[in-house]
Amino acid sequence: KLSAQEWFYYGRELFAHEKQEQAAEVLRAFLENPEGGAENKAEAVRMLAHCLQAAGKEEEGISLLLEGLQFAPPTGEHCCEIGEYFYEKGQWEQAIFWYENALHAERCTEQGAFVQEECYGFLPCIRLCVCYGRLGGWEMAKMYNEMAGVFRPEDASVRQNREYLAKRA
């Protein structure tokens, strides 16, 4: 019989290898086990939500992400997942809230944690640039684009945004 920790690692490996359906089953089993640690539960929720969203179950995925906030303070990855939901729906103010929180979120320091560095810098900055641009906040869009450029100076989207924003701001 697998321990809670082993269920988590197994689900994470399935997720990493893009075996969404199998990962979802294993992650659900892990989340039902009272033995799992809070940070692992929060990460499992994020992965399971991603699996659900990939299967076209966006509403179930976002509900799960929000429920997952009970386990641990949100990481940059968690904030970006929630921000992406609102971004895709064109709900710019809500997306801004989550992407700004991603920039200030604590990284998971648990040994073996998968930390996606882009969720603490480039990704929220480039998304914030677009969100503020969509709202007509050109100066904020410009500021976040330049911040994104600090993380990835040669990124094509940063250059394109720079050209676009030069005409707007």
Where do the model's predicted regions map?
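Short coil turns that delineate tetratricopeptide repeat
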Residues: 1, 35, 39, 73-74, ...
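Start-of-helix register in tetratricopeptide repeats
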Residues: 5, 39-43, 76-78, 94, ...
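"A position-specific structural signal for the A-helix of alpha-solenoid helical repeats
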Residues: 9, 47, 81-84, 88, ...
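TPR-repeat structural position
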Residues: 20-21, 58, 92, 138
